[in-house]
Amino acid sequence: MTKIIIFMVILVIITAAFVFKVLSRKKSYPPQSKVIDPIKITIQDIDRMEDGTGFVEYLYRLFLAMGYSDAYKTRGGRDFGPDLVFTDGEGVRNVVQAKCYSYPVGLGAVQEVYSSMRYYRAKKSMVISSNQYTSACEELAGYNAVRLHSRSDLIEIINFFKLGQIDKAKDILESEPRIVLESWDNKVIKKDFEVEKRWVAKK
């Protein structure tokens, strides 16, 4: 009889524990996604970000904190190129491609952000990277007036923002791109001459 009572008590305790666990699970809510505070983020934190999503979120929060109240993130895979869109101090819409890489950024970033300008009715485009750019990327950006913000620019923007010197941070962000004025015509002419020489030689 005593054994039966002990068994029943143990069974009740196990059942009660199971019910409590189930009810607790139902009442628990998923934790809210951590909101990035740009004032606390350093370049080292950015380097530790596992993918570009965190970097885009950081830049978005940074832009809002700098006073770009209309800044918004685009819709991932259906964004037609840019990660962010904002209006600068002159009232000009900018599209932004964010690249958090451990290696230099290539041509693709410039091609993507530049080709998205018409869709977003933007007059300016830029790429912001935690690294540097390849020479080919810099050349293409120069021909298309795409502003390339490298790691050093990003660090300056972060530092000025943390010091409360928002205007200086904005000056860097909104600075004009490096423009390549060399005409492509000369290169085309040279190429055509070479083709013509080969064609004449065959005759």
What are the roles of these predicted feature ranges?
Residues 1-80, 85-203:
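Mixed-charge (Asp/Glu-Lys/Arg
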